Amino acid sequence: MTAPLTLALSKGRIFEETLPLLAAAGVQVTEDPETSRKLILPTTNPDLRVIIVRASDVPTYVEYGAADFGVAGKDVLVEHGGSGLYQPIDLNIARCRMSVAVSAGFDYASAVRQGARLRVATKYVETAREHFAAKGVHVDLIKLYGSMELAPLVGLADAIVDLVSSGGTLKANNLVEVEEIMAISSRLVVNQAALKLKRTALKPILDAFERASQNGG
């Protein structure tokens, strides 16, 4: 008996916005990860199951073949490096941007011009390092895992690098966006070995995802 295909998803926005793409492939997830304690969820297709993992772990599960394919944000993929992954489709879901933000009273442009060494808090350390190095800005990077907006407010950092959607959270914490690093959307990633060995099973799903993403879901 052939093992089912495994799709790695994270809870929240990516999961919710992937559901219409699965529906386009004729598949529905039969349990809600927000209410179920299960981490392996069945679908209406007996040959496809969904596993729920942390967003930052999706590329790792796919890279090592624990999942055949997954959906991950560009932010996560850039930080991961993308090794061992085939990235065929930008799904155009979970769109936002990665930006530099500072306290409203901090003159970021002046600090950069004067060559000041800035402390920057972020969970995207590699991406931030590359960005500031390319601009010739001297930074000390502080790795955080959440509540980035707090760092400038309590003097931990001069700036943060984080994802911004509406900007409402920044505004609520008296922070301003000063620089956009990149536009973010979620991509389909496929294990390279699975693409070869399970191509017949994978291709109809990948094709349906691509059509749905081009048509806006």
UniProtKB/Swiss-Prot annotation:
Entry keywords, A to Z: Amino-acid biosynthesis, ATP-binding, Cytoplasm, Glycosyltransferase, Histidine biosynthesis, Nucleotide-binding, Transferase
Major subcellular site: cytoplasm
EC number: 2.4.2.17
Transmembrane recorded as keyword: no
Matching PROSITE patterns: ATP_P_PHORIBOSYLTR (PS01316)
Catalytic activity entry: 1-(5-phospho-beta-D-ribosyl)-ATP + diphosphate = 5-phospho-alpha-D-ribose 1-diphosphate + ATP
GO molecular function: ATP binding; ATP phosphoribosyltransferase activity
Pathway stated in the Swiss-Prot or TrEMBL entry: Amino-acid biosynthesis; L-histidine biosynthesis; L-histidine from 5-phospho-alpha-D-ribose 1-diphosphate: step 1/9
Coiled coil segments of this chain: none
Domain notes: Lacks the C-terminal regulatory region which is replaced by HisZ.
Role played: Catalyzes the condensation of ATP and 5-phosphoribose 1-diphosphate to form N'-(5'-phosphoribosyl)-ATP (PR-ATP). Has a crucial role in the pathway because the rate of histidine biosynthesis seems to be controlled primarily by regulation of HisG enzymatic activity.
Similarity comment: family membership: Belongs to the ATP phosphoribosyltransferase family. Short subfamily.
Protein name: ATP phosphoribosyltransferase
